[in-house]
UniProtKB/Swiss-Prot annotation:
Its job: Core subunit of the mitochondrial membrane respiratory chain NADH dehydrogenase (Complex I) that is believed to belong to the minimal assembly required for catalysis. Complex I functions in the transfer of electrons from NADH to the respiratory chain. The immediate electron acceptor for the enzyme is believed to be ubiquinone.
Organism expressing this protein natively: Marchantia polymorpha
Alphabetic keyword roster: Electron transport, Membrane, Mitochondrion, Mitochondrion inner membrane, NAD, Respiratory chain, Translocase, Transmembrane, Transmembrane helix, Transport, Ubiquinone
Main location per the UniProt record: mitochondrion
Gene field: ND5
Protein name listed in UniProt: NADH-ubiquinone oxidoreductase chain 5
Length: 669
């Protein structure tokens, strides 16, 4: 049964890819949805056996790579962390498959779409169940490939081509860091198996275990953790390598829901949680993680407030929430981070699928400024979007409230510079999150309509196959946090005993529960309320004042700064990409490939031999005394060298003769 959880999506993808022509669009949808749904049912059974009954399971299939000291096998590890991710991935993927049956019904290439969705799910399951870094890396690269295929599903659109290539290239940076981290792990531990590495982590955390670089020693565990974290930065869209995430909206909306809620972006958070025994012995790496996560949450929240594309606003909210998960790991509370990941999957999938219903009803229009007044036309979709938005901002007693507020309280009770930095940036991000969430609701559903009459006349609410996943996700967005809080992050729980590791000095969960002042606990709620009030005022009360501010010099520059995403794309394109392209052409291609390599290679050798042949041909004059003179000269030089060899060797290094000969050969070039 455990292996079927992983294999079933692969079978569905195989059937859709190779037999889609015979099964037809509806047959492919039924087969793939059935396979993923069965996988989700088995995941629920595995959750009961592994997590609730505390019975971790390890399955070793067969050896994979065996070479001298390097050994990697096909193995599957099912512990509490794994089964939580299995639940999230398979359930959300099942709902996305059901939703896509109706959403993609008019697309002629829907069999290919379902094939990609299923293979995406398979690679994510391979990633979370792997028992070694090599198998994890296989799933890691697989979800990158599947995301490229899904973002570029409508491959005739140039923007989809650009977005897919951008996602692939930016993730290559993070993947390179992860690959170096895996190599570092093997260098230190002589294995890539999680169980062996984590068991030996404390022994190798001493300062005398280091990597030597540029004659400087660097703590080995810290270097490995930083490199692994670079991989997470790329995959989980942290600041610096985040620019691919908003552009990934060029794919179909169900793809966005799957990428942002269950797969791809959650892989980085999962990997940090999986490697918690390593990160716990590297305080410096944890500080870096905390700062990067806090800055990401703040950056993405401020960027989302002035985006006009419906899906991009939700995409930046994903980026911001990932920042919360990352800095929760940075303050050594991996359980709360994974809990927030699970809660986030519910309301983020709900938001994206609700946005898909709006786009579907509005004839593929995504600009919120061209919507408005849809609450009366799409009451069901409006209710679903409202539930998702309230859960996102942490409205009391909804799912998001039980994890986001705990993360902020933990950051406050860390009592360190990094903890305070994360708390205040996270709290300010709550204000901006509330602002752009209510701005989205106002512009899309409550503001006076700006739509074309023909679009409004054809506007319709979600059909039944699209409504069922929305209803189930709405229940999850309301109740999951309340139902799972005590089990996953309650005081004294041993839910994570077989998967996560926290040093005793980093345990602050009990302190955050009882030592946090009441005013600190109320700050997120106050900021959420303030953000919603400001959003209402800006869009309904002081609209003329905002227009005057926006058209002023300062206001226009501020608007451009946030609307253009802090100019990250401009910096990357104008300074980094252009510089690398210029270097590649001027130096690598012209100076090296067509320059030095050609001179020292085929062109230079042929040119030199041709010139030498021309010079030697002049010696062949046809006169015997010329030949006799050359023979005498050569014999004299030969005898002189033999006789004076000891004297010459004393003054000239023999190894320089090769350089002299080569220089003589190329002296005429």
């Amino acid at each position: 049964m455990y292996l079927l959880i992983v294999i079933l999506p692969l079978i569905g993808s195989f059937a859709a890819g190779f037999f889609g022509r015979f099964l037809g669009s509806r047959g492919v949808a039924v087969v793939t949805t059935t396979c993923v749904s069965l996988s989700s049912i088995f995941s629920c059974i595995a959750f009961y056996e592994v997590a609730l009954c505390a019975s971790a399971c390890y399955i070793k299939i067969a050896p994979w790579i065996f070479s001298e000291l390097f050994d990697a096998a096909w193995g599957f590890l099912f512990d509490s962390l794994t089964v939580i991710l299995l639940l999230v991935v398979t359930i959300v993927s099942s709902l996305v498959h059901i939703y896509s049956i109706s959403y993609m019904s008019e697309d002629p290439h829907s069999p290919r779409f379902f094939c990609y969705l299923s293979i995406f799910t398979f690679f994510m399951l391979m990633l979370v169940t792997g028992d070694n870094f090599i198998q994890l890396f296989l799933g890691w690269e697989g979800v990158g490939l599947a995301s490229y295929l899904l973002i570029n599903f409508w491959f005739t659109r140039i923007q989809a081509n650009k977005a897919a290539i951008k996602a692939m290239l930016i993730n290559r940076v993070g993947d390179f860091g992860l690959a170096l981290g895996i190599m570092g792990c093997f260098t230190i531990f002589q294995t890539v198996d999680f169980s062996t590495i984590f068991a030996c982590a404390s022994a190798f955390s001493e300062p005398h275990h280091y990597f030597l670089f540029c004659n400087m020693g660097f703590h080995a565990i810290t270097v490995i953790c930083i490199l692994v974290f670079i991989g997470a930065v790329g995959k989980s869209a942290q600041i610096g390598l985040h620019t691919w995430l908003p552009d990934a909206m060029e794919g179909p909306t169900p793809v966005s829901a799957l990428i942002h809620a269950a797969t791809m972006v959650t892989a980085g958070v999962f990997m940090i949680a999986r490697c918690s025994p390593l990160f716990e012995y590297s305080p410096n790496a944890l500080i870096v993680i905390t700062f990067v996560g806090a800055m990401t949450s703040f950056f993405a929240a401020t960027t989302g407030i002035l985006q006009n594309d419906l899906k991009r606003v939700i995409a930046y909210s994903t980026c911001s929430q990932l920042g919360y998960m990352i800095f929760a790991c940075g303050i050594s509370n991996y359980s709360v981070s994974v809990f927030h990941l699970m809660n986030h999957a519910c309301f983020k999938a709900l938001l994206f699928l609700s946005a898909g219903s709006v786009i579907h009803a509005m004839s593929d229009e995504q600009d919120m400024r061209k919507m408005g007044g849809l609450a009366s036309l799409l009451p069901f979709t409006y209710a679903m979007m409202l539930i998702g938005s309230l859960s996102l901002i942490g409205f009391p007693f909804l799912t998001g409230f039980y994890s986001k507020d705990v993360i902020l309280e933990l950051a406050y009770t860390k009592y360190t510079i990094s903890g305070n930095f994360a708390f205040w940036l996270g709290s300010v991000s709550v204000f901006f999150t509330s602002y752009y969430s209510f701005r989205l609701l106002f512009l899309t559903f409550l503001a006076p309509t700006n739509s074309f009459k023909r679009d409004l006349s054809r506007c319709h609410d979600a059909p039944i196959l699209m409504a069922i996943p929305l209803i189930l996700l709405a229940f999850g967005s309301i109740f999951v946090g309340y139902l799972a809080k005590d089990m996953m992050i309650g005081l004294g729980t041993n839910f994570w005993a077989n998967s996560l590791f926290i040093l005793p000095k980093n345990e602050i969960l009990a302190e955050s529960e009882f030592a946090t002042p009441t005013i600190i606990k109320l700050i997120p709620i106050l900021f959420s309320t303030l953000g919603s009030f400001v959003a209402y005022s800006v869009n309904f009360v002081v609209n003329p004042l905002i227009f005057a501010l926006k058209t002023s010099t300062f206001g226009n520059r501020l608007y451009c700064f946030f609307n253009k995403r802090w100019f990250f794309d401009k910096v990357f394109n104008d300074f980094l990409a252009r510089s690398f392209l210029r270097f590649g052409y001027e130096v690598s291609f012209k100076a090296l490939d067509k320059g030095a390599i050609e001179i020292l290679g085929p062109y230079g050798i042929s040119y030199t031999i041709r010139k030498m042949a021309q010079q030697i041909s002049k010696i062949q004059s046809g006169f015997v005394y010329h030949y006799a003179f050359v023979m005498l000269l050569g014999l004299t030089i030969f005898i002189s060298v033999i006789g004076l060899w000891d004297f010459i060797s004393f003054w000239v290094d023999n190894r320089l003769y090769f350089i002299y000969i080569v220089s003589f050969l190329f002296i005429n070039i």
